[in-house]
């Protein structure tokens, strides 16, 4: 069993497009998850813009987008 949660929230909505934020939180006492994958499926024709360090990078045109990483709570 893991002690982590993943939540998604829409942070901005302009009608024809929106901005969202994933939050992945380790809820266990002083433990780490060295490998995880979070993903979301999108409808056909959707265009997803990948954001890194606060700026918009290249558009990503695919239906499934995943992010890998490490979560710690120590």
Curated annotation (Swiss-Prot):
Residues 53-74 are annotated as: N-terminus of 20.5 kDa chitinase. It comes from the Bacteria. It catalyses: Random endo-hydrolysis of N-acetyl-beta-D-glucosaminide (1->4)-beta-linkages in chitin and chitodextrins. Residues 28-52 are annotated as: N-terminus of 30 kDa chitinase. Its EC number is 3.2.1.14. The keyword Hydrolase applies. GO terms for biological process: chitin catabolic process; polysaccharide catabolic process. Gene3D superfamilies: Carbohydrate-binding module superfamily 5/12. Keywords: Carbohydrate metabolism, Chitin degradation, Glycosidase, Hydrolase, Polysaccharide degradation. Residues 1-27 are annotated as: N-terminus of 70 kDa chitinase. The 70 kDa chitinase is probably the precursor protein of the 30 and 20.5 kDa chitinases. GO terms for molecular function: endochitinase activity. Homodimer, but homotrimers and homotetramers could be observed for the 20.5 and 30 kDa chitinases. Belongs to the glycosyl hydrolase 18 family. Chitinase class II subfamily. Able to cleave chitin oligomers from N=3 to 6. This is Chitinases 70, 30, and 20.5 kDa. It comes from Streptomyces olivaceoviridis (Streptomyces corchorusii). The lineage of its organism: Bacteria, Bacillati, Actinomycetota, Actinomycetes, Kitasatosporales.
